[in-house]
Amino acid sequence: VTAWDSVLLAHYQEKDEFFWLNDSLISDKPAIQVADSMLFWLGNISQHGINPNYYPVDSIRGELQQIRTLNLRAGKTMNRLLADVEYQLTAAYLSYVCQLKFGFLPSERRWNDSIDHIPLKHCDTEFAMAALDSLRANPNAAFRRAQPSSPLYHKMQEELVRVNGWGVTDTTDYYRDRLLVNMERARWQYA
């Protein structure tokens, strides 16, 4: 169980508060953009070298459309659908923020130094709670703050775009793999 799973569970057990679904969900108010903004960021995860299928963006988008059109699938109640979408969006947000900050590779599988173990920071409940507070205060700013800000990381993102434009060859696969490994290492936070 990850820190963000613990925080997610604790939040919904202790509070009766929605982050994503509110009165504006079925109206034309701008606040509806929050869920759509989250789906935008999740849908563009490939800019970080992560498989775009890592998050269930299409599934969540389809469920949001069901809510907006009040067109429920057979056997699904509105309450259940709202709860599912709320939970999925919050779980995806916490996973996204924590993994962009501390890395997608599980800590037990990291070999950051073959001779000396270099201690790494991990996503803890304090960070995950702060991420929820940030989401509550200003969702769009929270999404932007979650993005890695290192100039080296941005350079690697530019290089990834360039390499992806080369097509598929043994050379590009080799180069892309090395680039993806270095992008992951750049996300790690050293203690």
Each language-model region and where it sits:
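Auxiliary tRNA-acceptor-end handling modules of aminoacyl-tRNA synthetases
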Residues: 1-191
